[in-house]
Amino acid sequence: MDIRAAEISAILKEQIKNFGQEAEVTEVGQVLSVGDGIARVYGLDKVQAGEMVEFESGVRGMALNLEQDNVGVVIFGVDRDIKEGQTVKRTGAIVDVPVGKGLLGRVVDALGNPIDGKGPIVASERRRVDVKAPGIIPRKSVHEPMATGLKSVDALIPIGRGQRELIIGDRQTGKTAIALDTILNQKPAHEGSDEKAKLYCVYVAVGQKRSTVAQFVKVLEDNGALEYSIVIAATASDPAPMQFLAPFSGCAMGEFFRDNGMHAVIIYDDLSKQAVAYRQMSLLLRRPPGREAYPGDVFYLHSRLLERAAKMGDAAGAGSLTALPVIETQANDVSAYIPTNVISITDGQIFLETDLFYQGVRPAVNVGLSVSRVGSAAQTKAMKKVAGKIKGELAQYREMAAFAQFGSDLDAATQRLLNRGSRLTELLKQPQFSPLKMEEQVAVIYAGVNGYLDPIPVNRVRAFEDGLLATLRGKHADLLEAIRASKDLSDESAAKLKGVVEAFAKSFG
């Protein structure tokens, strides 16, 4: 038998070298039961609320219910591979997602994993999904406009940077279309070099069909808008915990821009589905149900999410995060639980109606029920000057239109009011994917409120608008530029605009 001394000494040296090293300790628990996307785990005594845990199969979960003898874990993935008796280990980290400019142009799931097949995400940092909203001191009141490119919104229900404006309506009333047009309207700013004008877009799709999300992404891509957008998708086929988490993940990604002195808008489409997913999780975790079987903290779920949208003061970098949550109502019932909750949290709502949609008023905004509680402070002076009248005139028109159904013989003043109102309603219609710049909206609305549309038949209003815009873009680009640069309609610009509109109105027909 050949004994090699060198070999033995090498083995001994190796053993001596490793002597006294601590074994790696991970805290583990055991699965007691699993089903419906919920696992009950025994033994994770020191686990934190909201901590990520990992199952043997590699699937991750989040500890939500910390009870005396077990932990209720919601599973971010399929629970088919998880069996009773398997071990579960703590990760020691609260749920976080990658954030940064590297996510722009990408489609990710609720945990920030790419689902668009374009390779791994290059993130600058990771952030917790559920953090406290900024306090009162670092904030500043909303004062800059967030242009949507839609006449009916920018003129009547203006939105400011840092505001939370709810888009509410039944299914198929064009809620997502408003959000999509808002994203497309940011393209000119991103083509320019002014960093402050740029608005990054985050779109969170919750509980939607995959085909719908794919179509949305394709429209963004075709219009060159995906490069400044992030899409977070938790589709209908994803587990409820993913649908619950997606808005928080999107918010963390949006907060990166807010906290670094940039501006972002986040669209939650839609929060009704997030509430349903949260209700499902809560009931399976045996939390006591409340009104409409939602858990008692469903208000807190939405308030803590929407409070994170803010306009920061100069000391905090002057960034902003604007939120456009979407809520789907059933048969125009705004008094249901979730709609009333979100209406009370947000700074105003854009109310869309099925009847208007089918009458051909698109976007189908009900101007009477829609409000913006803080947006008027952010409206540009030029828009304020022309849009001030339109609100009053439309309100009178609605009142008179209801009244005129009863009487046939109307006096001239009432008839004039009805004519003006029907033309202004026609003027506020706008086809999809054609957002207008602020200065173009000002010119068009100026023509409407100053009576230049009154002699024109209602069905020719659209042609008048197109013609006027073509004239302005072609021969009077300097006038549009003056309004855009000053954000005001000076006496000189107003006189010039009056001349252009008058001349065009004479030649039109």
UniProtKB/Swiss-Prot annotation:
Ribonucleoprotein recorded as keyword: no
Residues in the signal sequence: none
The keyword Membrane is assigned to this record: yes
Site (Required for activity): S370
Protein residues bound to ATP: G169, D170, R171, Q172, T173, G174, K175, T176
InterPro entries: ATP_synth_asu-like_sf (IPR023366), ATP_synth_asu_C (IPR000793), ATP_synth_asu_C_sf (IPR038376), ATP_synth_F1_a_nt-bd_dom (IPR033732), ATP_synth_F1_asu (IPR005294), ATPase_a/bsu_AS (IPR020003), ATPase_F1/V1/A1_a/bsu_N (IPR004100), ATPase_F1/V1/A1_a/bsu_N_sf (IPR036121)
Membrane topology designation: Peripheral membrane protein
Keyword annotations: ATP synthesis, ATP-binding, Cell inner membrane, Cell membrane, CF(1), Hydrogen ion transport, Ion transport, Membrane, Nucleotide-binding, Translocase, Transport
Domain of life: Bacteria
Catalytic activity: ATP + H2O + 4 H(+)(in) = ADP + phosphate + 5 H(+)(out)
Molecular-function GO term, any one: ATP binding
Subcellular localization, as worded in the UniProt entry: Cell inner membrane
Enzyme nomenclature, EC number: 7.1.2.2
Cellular component annotations (GO), alphabetically ordered: plasma membrane; proton-transporting ATP synthase complex
A Pfam family: ATP-synt_ab_N
Free-text function comment from the UniProt entry: Produces ATP from ADP in the presence of a proton gradient across the membrane. The alpha chain is a regulatory subunit.
Subunit structure: F-type ATPases have 2 components, CF(1) - the catalytic core - and CF(0) - the membrane proton channel. CF(1) has five subunits: alpha(3), beta(3), gamma(1), delta(1), epsilon(1). CF(0) has three main subunits: a(1), b(2) and c(9-12). The alpha and beta chains form an alternating ring which encloses part of the gamma chain. CF(1) is attached to CF(0) by a central stalk formed by the gamma and epsilon chains, while a peripheral stalk is formed by the delta and b chains.
Family under the similarity heading: Belongs to the ATPase alpha/beta chains family.
Protein name as annotated: ATP synthase subunit alpha
